[in-house]
Amino acid sequence: MINLPSLFVPLVGLLFPAVAMASLFLHVEKRLLFSTKKIN
């Protein structure tokens, strides 16, 4: 049986920052789209 820390370390160390960056990027893109639509 594999030990859990060796499974969770890459998951938290790689997947969580990737999800955080992706959600932040989408949030900023949405705000930019809405702001440009309001100006036009």
Swiss-Prot record:
**Record-given protein name:** Photosystem I reaction center subunit VIII
Q: What is the lineage of its organism?
A: Eukaryota, Viridiplantae, Streptophyta, Embryophyta, Tracheophyta
**Keywords per UniProt:** Chloroplast, Membrane, Photosynthesis, Photosystem I, Plastid, Thylakoid, Transmembrane, Transmembrane helix
The superkingdom listed in its UniProt entry is Eukaryota
Q: What InterPro entries does the record tag this protein with?
A: PSI_PsaI (IPR001302), PSI_PsaI_sf (IPR036357)
- Presence of keyword Transmembrane: yes
SUPFAM superfamilies per record: Subunit VIII of photosystem I reaction centre, PsaI
Functional note: May help in the organization of the PsaL subunit.
User: What are the annotated disulfide bridges?
Assistant: none
Q: Where are the transmembrane segments?
A: 8-28
Query: Which family, according to UniProt?
Result: Belongs to the PsaI family.
Kindly indicate whether the keyword Transit peptide belongs to this entry. Answer: no
Question: Which cellular components does GO assign to this protein?
Answer: chloroplast thylakoid membrane; photosystem I
Q: Where, subcellularly, is it found? A: Plastid, Chloroplast thylakoid membrane
Its membrane topology: Single-pass membrane protein
**What biological-process terms (Gene Ontology) are attached?**
photosynthesis
